[in-house]
């Protein structure tokens, strides 16, 4: 049996490990491009060991996504065109946190109405993640929405890529199988499906409240890495 040597620098108990915000000194920050949805920045940052490096990244507003689960353990999926990858992707409800003074939970509820014409009486935090932390400040919170019903007025008519979005209900187990087979590759679909499976396997006891702390999001906003909301 192979024996691995543990670096003593990281020999603290595994249960204590977590991702933590840091405040490295930003020596210089430049806006390379101001886009319609997000911006591109170039920053010089001190690493704390005498090194200064320059990094470019997308300054993103952040986003929310909703894994809507009905009483038959089926997940709502919407098919949408995503131009940067040139693909039609099956994904949960999602949207940008681009409305000033709107909480993530309120934004998620708004997106659920706008994209699916649904409201939910039960909300939990499903999972938090950063989509591409090496090149983007985007943070995403996924909610689990249950006890679903039709929104007053039904499903609104969207525009652009959001016009006439096909919608299906897929059993969670089938969704997980498709994720593992590489048939679904959208990050919210992959992350949401696997997180929902893990929570279900624990009897949903591991779900966090809808108002759970979101330290990564708070740090990105407070440190000025997020694109300003309007």
Residue ranges and their predicted role:
Residues 40-44, 67, 77, 142-144, ...:
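Conserved hydrophobic/aromatic beta-strand scaffold that supports enzyme active sites
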Residues 25, 119-126:
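A short coil-to-beta-strand element that immediately follows conserved catalytic motifs
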Residues 4-10, 65-110, 152, 159-161, ...:
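Conserved Nudix-box catalytic region and its N-terminal flanking loop in Nudix hydrolases
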Residues 28-32, 127-132:
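Short, solvent-exposed loop/turn elements at beta->coil junctions and helix N-caps
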Residues 12-36:
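A short, N-terminal "cap"/entry segment at the start of jelly-roll beta-barrel domains
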Residues 28-67, 71-72:
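Acidic, metal-coordinating catalytic segment for phosphate/diphosphate chemistry
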């Amino acid at each position: 049996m192979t024996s691995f040597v543990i670096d003593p620098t990281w020999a603290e108990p595994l249960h204590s490990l977590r991702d933590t915000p840091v405040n490295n000194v930003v020596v210089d920050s430049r806006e390379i491009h101001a886009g319609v949805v997000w911006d591109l920045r170039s920053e010089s940052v001190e690493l704390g060991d005498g090194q200064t490096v320059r990094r470019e990244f997308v300054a993103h507003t952040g986003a929310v996504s909703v894994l809507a689960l009905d009483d038959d353990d089926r997940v709502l999926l919407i098919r949408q065109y995503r131009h940067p990858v040139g693909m039609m992707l099956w994904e949960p409800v999602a949207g940008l946190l681009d409305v000033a003074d709107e909480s993530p939970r309120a934004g998620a509820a708004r997106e659920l109405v706008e994209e699916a014409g649904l409201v939910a009486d039960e909300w939990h935090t499903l999972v938090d993640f950063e989509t591409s932390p090496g090149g983007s400040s985007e943070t995403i919170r996924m909610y689990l929405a249950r006890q679903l019903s039709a929104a007053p007025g039904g499903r609104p008519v969207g525009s652009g890529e959001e016009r006439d979005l096909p919608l299906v209900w897929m059993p969670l187990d089938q969704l997980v199988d498709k994720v593992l087979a590489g048939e679904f590759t959208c990050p919210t679909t992959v992350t949401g499906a696997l997180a929902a499976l893990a929570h279900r396997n624990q009897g949903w006891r591991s779900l966090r409240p809808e108002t759970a702390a979101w330290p990564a999001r708070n740090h990105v906003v407070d440190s000025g890495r997020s694109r300003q909301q309007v």
